[in-house]
Amino acid sequence: MRRERLPLTTGITMNVALTGPEDAPAVILLHGFPESHRTWRDLAPLLSDKLRLVMPDQRGFGDSDRPQEVDAYQTETLLADLFALADALGIERFALVGHDWGGAIAWAAAIKGDPRVERLAIVNSPHPLIFQKSLIEDEAQRAASQYMRAFRDPDFEKFVQGIGFEAFFDKSFGKHVDLATIPAEERSTYIAQWSRPGALTAMLNWYRASKMVVPQPGITVDVPDLVLRAFPKIAIPVRVIWGLEDKALLPVQLEGIGEIGDNVEVFPLKGVGHFAPWEAPEQVADALRPFLAGN
């Protein structure tokens, strides 16, 4: 696996990990919070024999540029990064794989209907309409998503500074996985990246720029416009891989998922949580491999 820092036409420089034959079908894999391309560290070797894998650190994460303005993390800007990355690598058409926030951008690209995206694979990342509806109607999901309200608090950086990045690492991953199973190298790398000037604010700005309404538990709120407006059906093939033990994104996110497109398959993973790409890389690879090959 090699790494490059690519200047993009969107004005940032993006760190990208690359592996697989350059003449193979291209797949862009988008990570989520609070990670980097390292999300795919155990999955990539299982897919790279017949696929060209492109694994960026999305803006604000890892070794990519970290704009400090909240507006720099609007969905349209993040989508522009995706297509600018493909342009920088000379990739015309590609499949998308997204986890967590990376899935949010992958969903957005598919909903937009850009013809460059040939197929979509999602790993534990909710469709925006289903997610917003669940935040209004499902008290369990609303309670599980209160961390989003915390991340939007302008004083959250001070909170993390107070507890330290070691404790933040434990809070971020500890409720999802056994911390003892995370390699020491991964822990030290993430903490070093988060400790850089402006890194934490850049990551949190993904939540602050989001228009997703996250009400406090137990209160009644008006139905957001996101729920009321019509969403176009996704025309390309979609495969949703879901760790059913996800404590942040509950199984309610799978309700109605088959209605969001014309060709949607769901692969539930029992005993697997939110960080499925490195909790169960073999199972995720088994679900991805035939799909990304067009089968």
Residue ranges: model-predicted function:
Residues 17-65:
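Conserved HGGG/HGGXW glycine-rich cap/lid loop of the alpha/beta-hydrolase fold
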Residues 32, 74, 199, 279-280:
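Active-site helix-initiating loop/hinge in glycosyltransferases
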Residues 36-37, 104, 272:
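A short, glycine- and basic residue-enriched loop/turn
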Residues 1-3, 12-14, 26, 54, ...:
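Flexible "cap/lid" subdomain of the alpha/beta-hydrolase fold that forms the substrate-access gate
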Residues 82, 284, 288, 292:
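Hydrophobic "lid"/C-terminal helical patch
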Residues 38-41, 201, 251, 286:
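Alpha-helical elements of the RecA-like P-loop NTPase motor core of helicases
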Residues 272-281, 285:
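Catalytic histidine-centered segment of alpha/beta-hydrolase-like enzymes
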Residues 41, 107-111, 285:
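Short, hydrophobic alpha-helix immediately C-terminal to the catalytic nucleophile
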